[in-house]
C-alpha cells in the first residue's frame, strides 16, 4: 500500500507540555532494568516491547510491525520532583530577570507592553526575525521595582549550568516552575514565548519522554553479552535516582537527603540532554570514556546534521591511490579493472541492445566487460552466478535492467578532497586499465591540487541517462580549462611538459627528418609529408597549433630588458605565431602552462573547448617525446660555480655585514636619522633588512651570471617556469639570506640576546639570524638554529591558515548556498529576494573574462595587425 503524499508547507517549533508527553507515550517506564534472565525485554522497563522492537524475530506490541519496519514509540518517566531543562536555563534566567517575583508580570509599564506587543505581532505577520525586539525587551525589563505591584526585585543570577540564585538564596526547580506559571499568556508573548505552542513553565520538566528503542538499540557483542546504548545507560541512572528520591520522600527522609537526591536527579537529566554542559563533570563509562548523549548526537562534525544529512556515504563509488599517465587524454581517467568489475551501470534492455546485454551476462561478474545483476520488470534483483547465468539468459527480454561493468567511454565523476572549488569535482571518461590505481593526466593536477605522493581520489558512477548527459555537457574536464576565479587556464602543462617544450623549440633545436618522425610517432601524432631536409623544433611544435592562429607575446624566459629587441632577442623570448606557424620565440610556461598559458587561453576562447583539449593533449605528448629525445637530468653539479664567483660573493657579503656594523655604530652614537613615522629602533631594523636583502639579491645575480642557460637544466627549469625559481638557485649556490620571524629579524631568545653565544644587546647580522652560507656549502650550527626558527614559523602559519580558511569556507558556503543567478542576470536567494541587480555589479562571468578584464585591447590590436600583415 502506498502512502498519501503530502507537501510540507511550514514547520513550527514549540515546546511539549507534560500532557503532550503523556499522550504521546505508550507506556510509563518505572523499572531501571532492560532484559530478564532469558533475554526478553522487561515490561515497563527501558526495552519494553511497546516502545518498538529491533529484533527481527519479535513484533512491536504497539503497532504489530516487525523489527526493521516499526518506527518506534515514545515512553515517559514521571519525575518525583521537577528539574530544569539544561537547554532552556539561559532563557529561564532571562525570563525570571524580566518578571516580578511576586505578581509574575513583565517589568514594563502597560504602555510599553502594548507598544512591544504590536511590534512583535507586526514582525510575526511579516515573517521577520523577533530576536532584536526580544533582546531589547529583556534589556528594558531589568528594573528594581515592579511597575504593577511595587514589589522590590532582587538580583537573579544563573550559576551554570542550571542553578538559579536570587540574592543569596538558591531557587529550587519547583519554585522556578511556580514563578513561570504565574506569567500570563499575554506577557509570555512579550518575552518571546508563543503561548499557542509553548508555556514558560514547560521549560522545567515534570515528565521526561523516553525515546523509542529504535533510537538507542542494544548490540550483542562477540562474547554473547548485550551492550546498551549510551542513552539507555543514562536513562537507567535517571530511573534509579528518581526511584530512590520517590522512596525517600514517601518515607519522610530528612530534607538534606531529599535535596541531595534531587540535585543528583538534576545532574543526570542535565547530562542526558548535554554531556558537555559547562560547569558539570561529564558522565562517563567504567572505562572513562564520556557518554555520547542527545546534544552530542546532533552537534559538530560527527553529529547527525553534518555527518548524516549534509554528507552521506554512497554506493556506486570507488576510492584508490592516483598515478600519473601522460598518454591518456585530459578528459579521461584510468580505472583499474578490479574496480570496473565491481562498480556497475544500469542499462535498460531494448530490442536493439539485447544481444550485447547477453554477451555481458555470458561473461558474468568475473570477466570484463560483464554484468553483476539483472533487475526484472517487477523490481526483483537477481545476482548473476555461473549457475544462474542460463536461467537469466533464457528469461532476458526488453524491460529488464542489466547492471553491467564499467567500460571505456562511460562518464564518471572524479573528485579529490578537500573540494574547495568547482573544479575539485569534474566528469571524466573511463579508460579501463590494468593494475590498481586511478590514472590521471598530469595537466589536470592543478585544479584538483593533486600530486602523486600517495594522494587518493574518489570516483562516482552515474546511474541515470539524464545525469550522464548533464555531466557530459557541463562537467567534462575540457569545459573547465578556464577558471571562474580569474578567467585564465587552470588546466595546462606542468613541469616536464614545459621543460620539454622549451628544449624542443629553443634556437639550437634542429632535428633530422628521421628524428622528427620518431618524435611524432612517440607522441602519437599524425606523420606529415616528407620535406627532405632537417626540421627546426619550432616547425615540429607548429604542427599542433590551429592553422589560422595569430599571436604575439613575451615568453616566461623574458629577462625584462629595458629596450625589447623583439625578434632579435638573444633569449628567444619574443614569441610570434603567424597563421599557425611558430616564427620566433620559445614555448614555455607562458604558452600553455596552468595559470599562465596564453596560447591555451586564446585557443579556448577563439576555437572552443574541443580544440583546446586536442591542443593540450597533442602539445603535452609532443613535449614529453621531446624531453625523452633530448634527455633531461639535474644534480647538485648544476649549482656548481667557479672559485672566482665564490670569492666575489664572499667579498660582497662581507661588505654588506660591514655596512650593517656601520649602521649599528651610527645608531649607538646617536647619528642615525629616524625615517618619517618610525622610531630609531624601527629605522635601524628596516635599514639593516634592506642592506642584507640587497646583499642576497646581488650575490644571487653574481652566481646567475656564471650559469649557462643552454646546458644548465636547473636554470632551464627555473627560467621557463617549469619548477622552482632563481631565488631557490641563489640560496643553494650563493647565500640563504636573512631569516625572519613575524616579519622582522630574529630578536627573541635569551635575556637581551638571541643565543648565549652572543654578547647582550648585540645587533649584528649574524646574531640576529642572517645566514651567510649557501645550502650547498652547508650552514653552521648557529645559522642552522636560526633557519629552523624561520622554517618553524612557516609550518605553524600554514597549519593555522588551513584551519582558518577551512572554517571560513564552511561559513560562506552555508550562508551563500541558496544564491543563484536568474534569467535576468540578477542574484536572488531561494525566496526570490534580490541580492544584486546585476551579477557582480557588471554582469560579467569571470571565467569568460580576460584575466579579470572584460576585453584585452592590446591583444586584439596585435592580432588584427598580424592578420592584416598575413
Swiss-Prot record:
<dbReference type="InterPro" id="IPR006592">
    <property type="entry name" value="RNA_pol_N"/>
</dbReference>
<dbReference type="GO" id="GO:0005737">
    <property type="term" value="C:cytoplasm"/>
</dbReference>
<feature type="binding site">
    <location>
        <position position="453"/>
    </location>
    <ligand>
        <name>Mg(2+)</name>
    </ligand>
</feature>
<dbReference type="GO" id="GO:0008270">
    <property type="term" value="F:zinc ion binding"/>
</dbReference>
<feature type="binding site">
    <location>
        <position position="73"/>
    </location>
    <ligand>
        <name>Zn(2+) 1</name>
    </ligand>
</feature>
<feature type="binding site">
    <location>
        <position position="63"/>
    </location>
    <ligand>
        <name>Zn(2+) 1</name>
    </ligand>
</feature>
<dbReference type="GO" id="GO:0006351">
    <property type="term" value="P:DNA-templated transcription"/>
</dbReference>
<dbReference type="InterPro" id="IPR044893">
    <property type="entry name" value="RNA_pol_Rpb1_clamp_domain"/>
</dbReference>
<comment type="subunit">
    <text>Part of the RNA polymerase complex.</text>
</comment>
<keyword id="KW-0238">DNA-binding</keyword>
<dbReference type="InterPro" id="IPR000722">
    <property type="entry name" value="RNA_pol_asu"/>
</dbReference>
<keyword id="KW-0548">Nucleotidyltransferase</keyword>
<dbReference type="InterPro" id="IPR007066">
    <property type="entry name" value="RNA_pol_Rpb1_3"/>
</dbReference>
<dbReference type="Pfam" id="PF04997">
    <property type="entry name" value="RNA_pol_Rpb1_1"/>
</dbReference>
<feature type="binding site">
    <location>
        <position position="70"/>
    </location>
    <ligand>
        <name>Zn(2+) 1</name>
    </ligand>
</feature>
<keyword id="KW-0240">DNA-directed RNA polymerase</keyword>
<keyword id="KW-0460">Magnesium</keyword>
<feature type="binding site">
    <location>
        <position position="149"/>
    </location>
    <ligand>
        <name>Zn(2+) 2</name>
    </ligand>
</feature>
<keyword id="KW-0808">Transferase</keyword>
<dbReference type="Pfam" id="PF04983">
    <property type="entry name" value="RNA_pol_Rpb1_3"/>
</dbReference>
<keyword id="KW-0963">Cytoplasm</keyword>
<feature type="binding site">
    <location>
        <position position="146"/>
    </location>
    <ligand>
        <name>Zn(2+) 2</name>
    </ligand>
</feature>
<dbReference type="GO" id="GO:0003899">
    <property type="term" value="F:DNA-directed RNA polymerase activity"/>
</dbReference>
<dbReference type="InterPro" id="IPR007081">
    <property type="entry name" value="RNA_pol_Rpb1_5"/>
</dbReference>
<dbReference type="Pfam" id="PF05000">
    <property type="entry name" value="RNA_pol_Rpb1_4"/>
</dbReference>
<dbReference type="InterPro" id="IPR007080">
    <property type="entry name" value="RNA_pol_Rpb1_1"/>
</dbReference>
<feature type="binding site">
    <location>
        <position position="100"/>
    </location>
    <ligand>
        <name>Zn(2+) 2</name>
    </ligand>
</feature>
<feature type="binding site">
    <location>
        <position position="451"/>
    </location>
    <ligand>
        <name>Mg(2+)</name>
    </ligand>
</feature>
<dbReference type="Pfam" id="PF04998">
    <property type="entry name" value="RNA_pol_Rpb1_5"/>
</dbReference>
<dbReference type="InterPro" id="IPR038120">
    <property type="entry name" value="Rpb1_funnel_sf"/>
</dbReference>
<dbReference type="InterPro" id="IPR007083">
    <property type="entry name" value="RNA_pol_Rpb1_4"/>
</dbReference>
<dbReference type="Pfam" id="PF00623">
    <property type="entry name" value="RNA_pol_Rpb1_2"/>
</dbReference>
<feature type="binding site">
    <location>
        <position position="455"/>
    </location>
    <ligand>
        <name>Mg(2+)</name>
    </ligand>
</feature>
<dbReference type="InterPro" id="IPR012758">
    <property type="entry name" value="RPO1N"/>
</dbReference>
<comment type="function">
    <text>DNA-dependent RNA polymerase (RNAP) catalyzes the transcription of DNA into RNA using the four ribonucleoside triphosphates as substrates. Forms the clamp head domain.</text>
</comment>
<dbReference type="GO" id="GO:0003677">
    <property type="term" value="F:DNA binding"/>
</dbReference>
<dbReference type="InterPro" id="IPR045867">
    <property type="entry name" value="DNA-dir_RpoC_beta_prime"/>
</dbReference>
<dbReference type="GO" id="GO:0000287">
    <property type="term" value="F:magnesium ion binding"/>
</dbReference>
<feature type="binding site">
    <location>
        <position position="103"/>
    </location>
    <ligand>
        <name>Zn(2+) 2</name>
    </ligand>
</feature>
<keyword id="KW-0804">Transcription</keyword>
<feature type="binding site">
    <location>
        <position position="60"/>
    </location>
    <ligand>
        <name>Zn(2+) 1</name>
    </ligand>
</feature>
<comment type="similarity">
    <text>Belongs to the RNA polymerase beta' chain family.</text>
</comment>
